Curated annotation (Swiss-Prot):
Free-text function comment from the UniProt entry: This protein binds to the 23S rRNA, and is important in its secondary structure. It is located near the subunit interface in the base of the L7/L12 stalk, and near the tRNA binding site of the peptidyltransferase center.
SUPFAM superfamilies in the record: Ribosomal protein L6 (SSF56053)
Parts forming coiled coils: none
HAMAP family tied to this protein: Ribosomal_uL6_B
Entry-linked PANTHER family: 60S/50S RIBOSOMAL PROTEIN L6/L9, LARGE RIBOSOMAL SUBUNIT PROTEIN UL6M
Organism, as annotated: Nitrobacter hamburgensis (strain DSM 10229 / NCIMB 13809 / X14)
Entry keywords, A to Z: Ribonucleoprotein, Ribosomal protein, RNA-binding, rRNA-binding
Protein name: Large ribosomal subunit protein uL6
PROSITE patterns: RIBOSOMAL_L6_1
Length: 177
């Protein structure tokens, strides 16, 4: 079994890390993030690295400390590089456009879908069939991408809909006569 939690998360130069109780805060060039670690997990800042260890020898604590370490690593990646997801829109007449703080989506419905862009997330539309979502919080970037994809998920017959750029859509054959 992999024990990813045993490896400490190194804090690069230009990033300040603070640990207060169960709260880990990271501040870097892309902003500030914080994460509250579960009580079953012990978190310490030692020698410029954040170390995570299970507080108890229970299965729950063993499972949670690897997750906590991955979350702390995502904080470091978020404040240094940030995160980005790309969506593609496939279908005749399907397109996206930015209007101020809202994303307008024409997805084959009788009306356009308006999506209010949340704080801390930037959305770019390089082409009418491409959407780029960026931010420093991995969870929020993924959540926004999933919400936009949820308006018209790709269907298996023609592949029409909103899909992730690296997503493969399993295609089905239509019914035969």
């Amino acid at each position: 079994m992999s024990r990813i939690g045993k490896r400490p998360v190194t804090v690069p130069s230009g990033v300040t890390a603070t640990v207060e109780g169960q709260t880990v805060r990271m501040k870097g060039p892309k902003g500030q993030l914080e994460f509250v670690v579960h009580n079953d997990v012990e978190v310490k800042l030692e020698n410029g690295a954040v170390k995570v260890a299970p507080r108890y020898e229970t299965n729950r604590a063993q499972a949670l400390y690897g997750t906590a370490r991955a979350q702390v690593a995502n904080l470091v990646a978020g404040v240094t590089k940030g995160f980005e997801k790309k969506l593609e829109i496939v279908g005749v007449g399907y397109r996206a456009a930015l209007q101020g703080k809202t994303l307008q989506l024409a997805l084959g419905y009788s009306h356009d879908v308006s999506y209010a862009i949340p704080e801390g997330i930037t959305i770019a539309v390089p082409k009418p069939t491409e959407i780029t979502i960026a931010g420093n919080d991995a969870q929020r970037v993924g959540q926004v991408a999933a919400e936009i994809r949820g308006y018209r998920p790709p269907e298996p017959y023609k592949g029409k809909g909103v899909k992730y750029a690296d997503e493969f859509i399993f295609r089905k054959e239509g019914k035969k006569k």
